[in-house]
């Protein structure tokens, strides 16, 4: 197909202004100096996400599908949704569990790897809620589930991701600190903490409080201050009660920052729950690395030595809120979530006609998965002969509060595994949430706060920039129900600005850049199919391509 030059101006806005003004307007088009070239069959696409099972079947009926395709969107990106809900993705319901002590795959547990061998048609796929979760809620959980850190049950626990330990990264654990944050909802007086450790526990850690308003949403408006007695250099595990300061301190947010693990395993004969009761001769190394906490308690110690806990311990969203750096993707069959919604099965996706037969951008789960499962997924797709354009690695790591060095460490492990299947595959990410400004995180040792700067730095320091074939992010510029017509004038600068931000952060100017989800608002996207949205859409796409973008994907197709 003939390459089409992009008009080097926000032309639709100019037309709108012309229609609103009595004064004559002149639009100059110089086709001899295009700012970009694009091929519509590669550039103008749409996304398919997790939806109701009933909707999947209805939307793929020929009359409905024909109307969908008539919209004109060309390539499709398959969106990865289970990561937003802190779930492990069984992209293939057939597969094997790492722990087969129950003598059958169906009754196994541990780490699941989908079968790479095509057999029965995969029509739907589902997520499994992770039982070692440490986050009460994030931007994708929809207030479903809860943290095991304040659930009131000492037989459950949070555990960090084993793939972020030296065993897999090849780097000191101090370079990938793991953390949990407690949000007290309001400022309260604190001088003591009690930590009920599981194994492995932290040998070295510090307990800190935040000096600003919100360390999750305003990461540069405050600092983490270590309590005067909050440094532990030789932790012993079990249940530790620590007097953090001589006098109570007024705080709202408290963080435990862990830098050295005991790297110890639970004695299977002493295990108090089924998660850890495994045959000691078949012990999985992943169960013995990282950090694990059964329950957290925070409050004050009175002069008589009594500890008074102020946290709310419930197995629901009313618990004291906690956040965690990562989650161990260990799970078992009983953790299957709701089956009313599903990711479309790969075989249904590629044979239904929704892709038009064009190569599709496919995802792999990464934040809550294993590299073996990701590699098996790609092997399956290749054995089926399904065309793949790009592979997007993980979903919205920024919305999961993951530090860039942790994402990068996982990225390289997954890239290695996938490229063993096919070295020619083009991988990318990080599929940021739709934002209009640079994504910032707590400063590193050098004071750097830009997520993208630190991600790119990590790849360069490890000599692996070649594993990043494209850069992806989402674009949802406006809040729902608050989009006056005047905001149409803002869009060209919004998308131009954020594109320039990524380049300023170190994304190479010649690296393909994709907006892999885009609409007016993430909160109410389907309601905007009107004139306002049409005008915005044309301006948004034109401005992004004018800024050098490679492709956009409307969210969403079905």
Where are the model-predicted features located?
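Trp- and acidic/polar-enriched beta-sheet ligand-binding modules for extracellular glycan
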Residues: 175-176, 199-300
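N-terminal substrate-binding region of glycoside hydrolase catalytic domains
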Residues: 30-128, 297-346, 354-369, 373-376, ...
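N-terminal signal peptide c-region/cleavage motif recognized by signal peptidases
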Residues: 18-21
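Noncatalytic carbohydrate-binding groove/subsite architecture in carbohydrate-active enzymes
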Residues: 371, 376-377, 404-543, 547
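Disordered, acidic Ser/Thr/Pro-rich linker "stalks" and the adjacent N-terminal cap
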Residues: 95-186, 198-201, 221-222, 229, ...
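N-terminal module-boundary/linker segments of secreted carbohydrate-active enzymes
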Residues: 25-58, 408-411, 415-417, 428, ...
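Loop/turn elements at helix/coil->beta-strand transitions in domains of secreted/extracellular proteins
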Residues: 40-44, 72-78, 250-252, 355-360, ...
